[in-house]
Regions:
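Beta-rich ligand-binding surfaces for carbohydrates and other polyanions
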Residues: 2-269
Length: 269
């Protein structure tokens, strides 16, 4: 569960427009736009093992003593080593892709020290128990952004899809009441499950009678719906010079592809 946050700090962050919404324990992504943060005493958690998926158990904790600590399977694996450097410390990511631990609103005590062009970035607690920063944004779905169900979730759902992954017909991603599904007719659909009719927020409008569709994300950040083994039904048509990217179903109901991987605690290869 998430630990209590500093209410005065939260009010200040909201007042100065530095925070879109506070995260919950089952979140594991921080965004530069709309901006989110990991607040004092909060924990992000990634654990799909209760669903018989061998990813997790990973946690990222912004400790009250100002140290940002990463745990994997109960063991400490990485930290900013900023214990005692301030009060009310919190983690954000800026529009250049740099992760920053700050105290008292705007005094930095730690930086990731990797930057890129101005854009939209995502800071991820990854499936392998490491941290990664991706961006800038390459592509986003055309639907309007909105807020998800404010009720906290008690289980981790996977809402990030990485390069080199392939998924067949069925549920692809899920964040609270938003669900990305590849239907049996090969239409990739983003649904709001809070409505009686499961309103469609976005779709590829694709169809195939073969019922053998799958989606894949290329290293260069291009998303595909394919069938008949490799024939393309739909593509996002946006690419970048990248060897690894990530598709994220955000809390505002937008699908966004970020790439390349700008920074990580441990390279994948």
């Amino acid at each position: 569960m998430a630990f209590p946050t500093s209410v005065p700090l939260l009010i200040l962050l909201l007042t100065f427009g530095l925070l879109g919404r506070p995260g919950s324990a089952t979140d594991f992504v921080i965004y530069s736009d709309p901006p989110t943060a990991l607040l004092p005493g909060q924990m992000f958690h990634y654990d799909l093992t209760p669903q018989d998926i061998p990813y997790g158990r990973a946690s990222l904790v912004m400790k009250p003593d100002c140290n940002l600590v990463l745990y994997f399977n109960g063991s400490k694996t990485w930290a900013t080593n900023t214990t005692g450097l301030g009060d009310n410390c919190y983690l954000t990511i800026d529009s250049h892709g740099e992760a920053i631990v700050q105290r008292n609103i705007h005094y930095p005590v730690w930086r990731s020290n990797k930057t890129s062009v101005v854009g939209s970035y995502a800071f991820l607690l990854q499936w392998n128990g490491e941290l990664g920063i991706y961006g800038p944004a390459i592509w986003s779905s055309s639907n309007e952004g909105e807020l998800s169900d404010p009720k906290p979730s008690n289980i981790t759902t996977d809402y990030v899809f990485y390069s080199y992954s392939v998924l067949p017909i069925g549920k692809i991603l899920e964040y609270k009441n938003y669900r990305l599904v590849l239907r049996d007719d090969c239409n990739l659909v983003l649904l709001d499950t809070n409505t009686n009719t499961q309103d469609i927020k976005w779709q590829t409008n694709t169809y195939s009678p073969l019922h053998d569709c799958f989606i894949t994300l290329d290293p260069n950040g291009e998303l595909f719906v394919k069938h008949n083994r490799r024939d393309i039904l739909w593509r996002s048509n946006e690419t970048t010079n990248s060897n690894f990217s990530a598709l994220v179903l955000r809390y505002d109901a937008k699908l966004v592809i970020y790439g390349p991987q700008l920074w990580t605690t441990k390279p994948l290869w």
